[in-house]
């Protein structure tokens, strides 16, 4: 049974001293959440417990989460186009920003759902994150997928401070290129 009072939203592991930084990942309860992110420990569809936001792009926010029935750590990508949407007062429901943006918002959500369908078709392919399911709640769409810990390519490249050699780039990209063939 999960003890939410001692669960770290930064890594979804037990933090025996929740008032102190997590001994596993260093997350502090004083960490500022990303703007427009779901509140930590929100629950989706009664089965996914939301942890910290992992990142944000123009069309969505990705969260660390836990599938409650199995206590499996997953990543959940939320459709949240920052230029077209805002949160309702409940801090969970996503709303088109303005009346004239509803069409663009819903068209984008349909495209987002297609992205989920493509990811589902590619499940089982080496080099591609594993799709788990698609959710539609809070007036938006969510893609639930396997959580792969580690650095993003962008962060990795920033740390390296030098470009990949042709051989390194090919080694990294080859499984993805084969999956997309």
Locations of regions flagged by a protein language model:
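Conserved short submotifs of the Hanks-type protein kinase catalytic core
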Residues: 138-152, 156
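AlphaC helix of the eukaryotic protein kinase fold
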Residues: 89-122
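Conserved N-lobe loop of protein kinases adjacent to the ATP-binding glycine-rich P-loop
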Residues: 66-74, 80-84
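Protein kinase glycine-rich loop
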Residues: 51-57, 62
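A short, low-complexity linker immediately N-terminal to eukaryotic Hanks-type protein kinase catalytic domains
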Residues: 31-50
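Protein kinase catalytic-loop region centered on the HRD/HxD motif
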Residues: 176-181
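Activation-segment/catalytic-loop signature of the eukaryotic protein kinase fold
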Residues: 134
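Activation segment signature within eukaryotic-like protein kinase domains
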Residues: 172-173
């Amino acid at each position: 049974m999960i003890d939410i009072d001692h669960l770290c939203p930064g890594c979804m592991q037990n933090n025996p001293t929740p008032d102190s930084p997590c001994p596993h990942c260093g997350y502090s309860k004083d960490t500022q959440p990303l703007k427009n992110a779901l509140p930590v420990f929100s629950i989706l569809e009664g089965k996914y417990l939301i942890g910290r936001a992992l990142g944000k792009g123009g069309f969505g926010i990705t969260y660390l989460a836990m599938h409650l029935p199995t206590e499996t750590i997953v990543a959940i990508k939320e459709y949240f186009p920052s230029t077209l949407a805002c949160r309702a007062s409940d801090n969970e429901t996503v709303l088109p920003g303005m009346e004239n943006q509803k069409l663009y918002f819903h068209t984008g959500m349909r495209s987002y759902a297609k992205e989920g369908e493509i990811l589902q078709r590619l499940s089982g392919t080496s080099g591609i994150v594993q799709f788990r399911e698609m959710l539609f709640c809070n007036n938006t769409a969510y893609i639930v997928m396997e959580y792969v810990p580690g650095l993003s390519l962008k962060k990795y490249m920033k740390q390296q401070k030098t470009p990949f050699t042709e051989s390194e780039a090919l080694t990294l990209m080859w499984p993805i290129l084969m999956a997309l063939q």
